[in-house]
Amino acid sequence: MSDWIGVALFIVVGIVFGAGGMLTSFLIHPRSKNKFKLETYECGLPTEGATWVRFKTQYFTYALMFVIFDVEVIYLYPWAVSFVDLGLAGLIKMFLFIFILVLGLWYAWKEGALEWK
């Protein structure tokens, strides 16, 4: 049970710091709204027409695919650095990891997630 006290303390301190920062920000933020505060910031030009521009959801799909396959570098780099020490077992595990990633990429390609519509 004493092993979990550190984890619980870490979670509580994290929540307190997060909530404390949000509360402090709320309490000290400037509340006055005037003409200058509502204008376009710095060198921006005043907008003409509708300011809400809709982005295609295809951008979201590409961004999500990038994040998914970019995270693999976090695992590939340490493996490449310690490749000699890990031996054959490390090589097999990394090939399995890469196979799963390629399988996911193949599935996304098959479902049309990489096609621009």
From Swiss-Prot:
GO MF terms, alphabetically ordered: NADH dehydrogenase (ubiquinone) activity; NADH:ubiquinone reductase (non-electrogenic) activity; quinone binding
Gene this protein is translated from: nuoA
Enzyme Commission code(s) on record: 7.1.1.-
Catalysed reactions, as listed in the record: a quinone + NADH + 5 H(+)(in) = a quinol + NAD(+) + 4 H(+)(out)
Stored InterPro entries: NAD(P)H_OxRDtase_bac/plastid (IPR023043), NADH_UbQ/plastoQ_OxRdtase_su3 (IPR000440), NDAH_ubi_oxred_su3_sf (IPR038430)
Top-level class of the enzyme under EC nomenclature: translocase
Superkingdom of origin organism: Bacteria
Role played: NDH-1 shuttles electrons from NADH, via FMN and iron-sulfur (Fe-S) centers, to quinones in the respiratory chain. The immediate electron acceptor for the enzyme in this species is believed to be a menaquinone. Couples the redox reaction to proton translocation (for every two electrons transferred, four hydrogen ions are translocated across the cytoplasmic membrane), and thus conserves the redox energy in a proton gradient.
PANTHER family xrefs: NADH-UBIQUINONE OXIDOREDUCTASE CHAIN 3
UniProt KW keywords: Cell membrane, Membrane, NAD, Quinone, Translocase, Transmembrane, Transmembrane helix, Transport
Family: Belongs to the complex I subunit 3 family.
One of the record's GO cellular component terms: NADH dehydrogenase complex
Membrane topology: Multi-pass membrane protein
The protein's name in its UniProt record: NADH-quinone oxidoreductase subunit A
Membrane-crossing segments per the record: 4-24, 64-84, 86-106
